[in-house]
Amino acid sequence: MTIAVGRAPAERGWFDVLDDWLKRDRFVFVGWSGLLLFPCAYLALGGWLTGTSFVTSWYTHGIASSYLEGGNFLTVAVSTPADAFGHSLMLLWGPEAQGNFVRWCQLGGLWNFVALHGAFGLIGFMLRQFEIARLVGVRPYNAIAFSGPIAVFVSVFLMYPLGQSSWFFAPSFGVAAIFRFLLFLQGFHNWTLNPFHMMGVAGILGGALLCAIHGATVENTLFEDSEQSNTFRAFEPTQAEETYSMVTANRFWSQIFGIAFSNKRWLHFFMLFVPVTGLWMSSIGIVGLALNLRAYDFVSQELRAAEDPEFETFYTKNILLNEGIRAWMAPQDQPHEKFVFPEEVLPRGNAL
């Protein structure tokens, strides 16, 4: 008689079967994150293409914003809902549209649709990077880096209008529409003088500079290890040896600046840290704007410029330009308010 010792194999449930199917090796990995990413990305992109192709902004902004109305790639947009709707989610079955799809598009419901599905799509893409990193066995710094763009999207398209009176003050989804929003931020918030904007610019441009320097330095110090027609053919993805000389690169920059990175890990962490921190700082600044927080106000210069016509600085010039943006942009940007500015309140002074 034979006695078998051991555990009976556990019965596989539907969760295990689904887990196997989602993580199967295929051309486009799905994964659990794909259940969020793919539907949301598809709906956000589809909503944007539909809106820019066919949907007018006449009822919300008093403008034409689609290819059907004669716009082009730079001028079409999916526009924000009207100011009167506040922070309504603008659901298709909500009290505004009452299930009428055409009316829902006319009232700006597509903007909420694209913004919310876009936000969840970006989050799904970050989760995808976490999931694949875990399966491959690498650290999740790609996902951490992608938190920067997510922070910017959420702060600009969701947090800022939530701090203002309605979704109307968020940027519409279009090229020229984003430019309008930038002018709005400058005129109403003096955004370029905000220290968080300065940190964001330093991070993005600093990251671009580091990327250019790093790429050029690596190309400069490639080992001449082949007789191939060009240096790129000499590289094998599985080769054990280095493909460029860190020692030579270190010596080069030591001669240029008197200082250089000697640790590859610190160098690449720095290249990650600079742009991502810049994006996060910009996001924090936008949340501050949502709450109408002021940045730098050099009141002493403004007072002196008001008293002395011969005194002005670049700061006082910019303040006057901001007043001009507010006075001339508000009637165009918010026609529903029916703003009328008398001649005497329009900005005058040395700058204009």
Swiss-Prot record:
The keyword tRNA processing does not apply. Pfam families: Photo_RC. It catalyses: 2 a plastoquinone + 4 hnu + 2 H2O = 2 a plastoquinol + O2. Chlorophyll a ChlzD2 binds at residue 117. Keywords: Chlorophyll, Chromophore, Electron transport, Iron, Magnesium, Membrane, Metal-binding, Oxidoreductase, Photosynthesis, Photosystem II, Thylakoid, Transmembrane, Transmembrane helix, Transport. Belongs to the reaction center PufL/M/PsbA/D family. This is Photosystem II D2 protein. It comes from Synechococcus elongatus (strain ATCC 33912 / PCC 7942 / FACHB-805) (Anacystis nidulans R2). The gene is psbD1.
